[in-house]
Amino acid sequence: MAPQMTQFIESKRPYQEVGHALRQMIINMDFAVGDKLPPEREIADMLSVSRTVVREALIMLELENLIEVRKGSGIYIVALPHQRENVATEPCALNAAGPFELLQARQLLESNIAEFAATQATPLDIANMRSALQRERDELKTGEDETGDREFHLAIAEATHNSMLVELLRQSWAWRENNPMWLKLHTRIADKEYRKEWMTDHQVILAAMIKKDPAAAKEAMWQHLENVKQCLLELSDVDDPNFDGYLFNSYPVDLVRN
């Protein structure tokens, strides 16, 4: 099976390569909705990659609503790639959007999601946020990719208990992960200090969630994404004809309070 799967891998980021291989495996091996994929370790062995890369690929497919990872049970197919229209990883107009346009959309969406989540979060939701934050800490120590970052933002959306808001969040992250300019910028974020600062932002957001303070949660999320934007501005090539940093400026955080 390994040679058949490996031939589908193209020149992308490792987790995207594995995700593409898994999509093709689902199509070519006639899997059906409800079928179970091989376990994480077996996939890693088949593709000769680390389990961390496989885990990131599975998160990507979860964001696309193709699979569901059930703790203690396995990886299940919930939709077939060829059955779904407008899959986020397929070429679309949104992939032509610049990273700052995406960030502006995320600020508007996620700050309001955080505000609402602070009023709805259960003890289990808070536990999920804590777990994602701990994963971020672990990844920072080992230098792994930012799986915990995605999990933290998704845990906040899930705390709203509104499936549409969760889906909007999933789609925005899928667009982010497949946006060419975002990926280009992301490769320049080698300094761990940025990630430490963003993790500190997440701690502030979590504190607001625990206190059930919607205004503080909204402000903290807005400021977090503003900090991400400022980091990307520092790393951007302003002479790039596709640079959109000054076209999608955000409101100062003090205006968000009003």
Regions found by a protein language model. Give the residues of each.
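Short linear motifs at protein or domain termini
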Residues: M1-E115, T119, V253-N258
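C-terminal effector-binding regulatory domain of bacterial HTH transcription factors
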Residues: A2-Q4, A215-N258
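Short, 15-30-residue, compositionally biased linear elements
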Residues: P14-Y15, E193-M199
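Short helix-coil transition/hinge motifs at the ends and kinks of transmembrane helices
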Residues: E90-C92, L185-E193, N242
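Short coil/turn linker motifs that delimit alpha-helical repeat modules in TPR/alpha-solenoid proteins
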Residues: L102, K141, E193-Y194
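Conserved amphipathic alpha-helical segments that form helical-bundle/coiled-coil interaction surfaces
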Residues: A105-L183, M199-H202, A207, A216-Q230, ...
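Well-ordered alpha/beta subsegment
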Residues: I210-K211
